[in-house]
Amino acid sequence: MAKALQGVMAALLTPFDHQQQLDSESLRRLVRFNIEQGIDGLYVGGSTGEAFVQSLAEREQVLEIVAEEAKGKITLIAHVGTVSTAGSQQLASAAKRYGFDAVSAVTPFYYPFSFEEHCDHYRAIIDSADGLPMVVYNIPALSGVKLTLDQINTLVTLPGVSALKQTSGDLFQMEQIRRAHPDLVLYNGYDEIFASGLLAGADGGIGSTYNIMGWRYQGIVQALREGDVAKAQRLQTECNKVIDLLIKTGVFRGLKTVLHYMDVVSVPLCRKPFAPVDEKYLPELKALAQQLLEEKA
């Protein structure tokens, strides 16, 4: 199973309609679009998927739709993390029911939980996942939970944990984790340092911008596999030019707007309180969509 979890995994966006409801048809198109561009797998219901502005029922619905569209074609990882252990367990059970390959959970956040409470939280989710491997999700910039290296080492050695999504710019820590855990599946989480993350020991990555240019990240993997560091650097630079624009527009709404211009997502809106993209960026995003479509073809 560990080998199946390696690779380039798109952190799937969740499309909504003008009434802020789940757009299931756009979601299905987005899943197919990711499969067509050669993604190894999907990370469903995470930060990029706006999970924390959805109800548990909506998150279950997203898992079900994605499984219907992609099960057996690519690797599927369900992010089931919530502040509540019970809510996370409910989603983990759903992931098992729908045939996902693994579950993942962000560290419980908002309240100042003790580290032992974090460990108990993961143990309970792993139990509810009924044999599915766990991907621990470390994202200190958003969760506010700043794990020490020793704490990370403890979490990734809990029974049932197979992987770590390391969304941190600390490449030294990435290398330390790899050195300490040679068999752990280790994902780079920040797209802008994907190539550097691989060189620091990551097996692959989970990222939001893979939704619109996954083939570039696959190209970086292939270039490094062949020892062509210069090519990997060039591809990373091209990815980062896109990321520069998305940071200006707001990453999730910018991605949805690009996918709208690619005829994948019907409505380029995130759920409130996220606002729409500022209209001044629309020409640049439209040009980017056209460029990427031509490149993909």
Curated annotation (Swiss-Prot):
Keywords: Carbohydrate metabolism, Cytoplasm, Lyase, Schiff base. Coiled coil: none annotated. Pathway: Amino-sugar metabolism; N-acetylneuraminate degradation; D-fructose 6-phosphate from N-acetylneuraminate: step 1/5. Its main location: cytoplasm. The keyword Lyase applies. It catalyses: aceneuramate = aldehydo-N-acetyl-D-mannosamine + pyruvate. SUPFAM superfamilies: Aldolase. InterPro entries: Aldolase_TIM, DapA-like, NanA, Schiff_base-form_aldolases_AS, Schiff_base-form_aldolases_CS. The keyword Cytoplasm applies. PROSITE patterns: DHDPS_1, DHDPS_2. GO terms for molecular function: N-acetylneuraminate lyase activity. Pfam families: DHDPS. Aceneuramate binds at S47, T48, T167, G189, D191, E192, S208. Gene3D superfamilies: Aldolase class I (3.20.20.70). Belongs to the DapA family. NanA subfamily. Catalyzes the reversible aldol cleavage of N-acetylneuraminic acid (sialic acid; Neu5Ac) to form pyruvate and N-acetylmannosamine (ManNAc) via a Schiff base intermediate. This is N-acetylneuraminate lyase. It comes from Salmonella arizonae (strain ATCC BAA-731 / CDC346-86 / RSK2980).
